Amino acid sequence: MLFRSTFLIFGDPQIGCSGSIDDDNGGWTNTLNHALAKAPNANFLFSMGDQINAYYKYDTSNLSQVEEEYDGFLNAPQLTQLPLATELGNHDCGYNTALYGQHFTLPNISEKYGQVSGDAYGDNAVDSESTGDGDYYFTYNNTLYMVLNTSCLSIAEHKAFLEETIQANPDVTWKVVSFHKSIYSVASHVTESDIVTLRNGLSPILSQLGIDIVLQGHDHVYARSYIMGGESGMTADVQKNADGSALTEVTNPDGVQYITMNSASGSKFYKITEEAFEYTAVQNQEKVPNYSVANVTKDAFTVTTYRSTDDSVVDTITIKKSKNGWETVDGKDYWYEDGVKQGTEGRGKEIYDPESDAWYWLDSDANGAKAVSKDVYQESDGGKWVRYDANGQMIKGWNTNENGTYYFDPITGAMAHGTVEINGKTCHFDEATGILK
């Protein structure tokens, strides 16, 4: 499996919102140009919804306006170069039109979860595939991307979708959720009733499911939250530098990182509200179109946001996963502590794994791999022989193999030699081999 990928993230292009489709297309195309120049090896594009502005004010008699806006979005030549993932924004799901689903092909789209009432689409609502209505997911390399339709306010549906999708994709390193309506933003939408419903409902679920990062749009402003811990709010982790600025790197955070993307076209910007939200780590509004570059590896997920005018950095955040515990590589098990492989210091190392409640030996002769079915001489406790079974666990008590019967101390694991008193009985073991006589 490949472990490195790059994708580009764009907040609401909302073509047509400024009143000039041509101007909005120009801004959108310019941002795409800058993004692809910054990350020429990007693997795909990800739009946070509201690709167009049409909304529900246009009925079936005025679909030409809607199509002109879609043309303004899709005619950007860069969209022919890479796959494009989109979200259903509130401006995309207008009454009496199912055009969103007719313009975008979405993988693994649910016909059970994330549905909006058919009334929102009038007589054109047929199924999820034709409307683009419904939660969906895709995987790329080591990452699972789950896209929720936040025009649907059923928390139960979104929860079921997330749980079933995660269960069906157990071997990913990163879990990303994306949806249009930002629940941790700094613009005026954040206090509206639908956003409050989504925030109160989704936040604890996303934390419980171990989601790493949430990508959002809707508010045409840039905002990055602190690491959020669901119902308990911000996690207890220290999240500021000594000078009070927000951290730009966190390791093994106990919570979820939320990022809200600014407009990618410049068709509309919102003001940052006067209210100071305690969950906000970074906020920015310069009325300059933004784009974000996400770089994903096995150990780190970095999102850096840039201004499309000069490619200067607005903000960056890196989430690192420092390995702790066992990791299997090429059929061998290795033990990590704070991301550092143990047992490679020129001599072996005994470690205790609380999850299995057992002791193991890391064999320096095998680059720190777990010793299995092996007798090991350890210099601790004045020197002792210890045996590890086929699972690598230290053997304690009586043990028999093809050579004979042995006894290992129930606390230290030391092989018995000579005459030993065991449970009130005198036992004699070979001084050299430890075999019971």
Task: Give, region by region, the residue ranges found by the protein language model.
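Extended active-site neighborhood of metal-dependent phosphoesterases/phosphodiesterases
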Residues: 1, 59-173, 201, 227-282, ...
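Acidic, histidine-bearing metal-coordination/catalytic regions of metal-dependent phosphoesterases
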Residues: 1-17, 38, 297-322
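N-terminal active-site segment of His-dependent metallophosphoesterases
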Residues: 1-59
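Active-site-proximal beta-strand elements of phosphoester/diester hydrolases
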Residues: 5-17, 142-151, 176-180, 257-263, ...
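Active-site neighborhood of phospho(di)ester-bond hydrolases with catalytic His/Asp-centered motifs
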Residues: 9-11, 44-50, 82-90, 148-149, ...
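Active-site environment of divalent metal-dependent phosphoester hydrolases
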Residues: 15-19, 52-56, 88-97, 154-156, ...
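Active-site-proximal segments of metal-dependent phosphoesterases and phosphodiesterases across multiple
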Residues: 56-67, 172-216, 224-227, 232-235
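Extracellular adhesion/carbohydrate-binding repeat motifs centered on closely spaced tryptophans
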Residues: 322-437
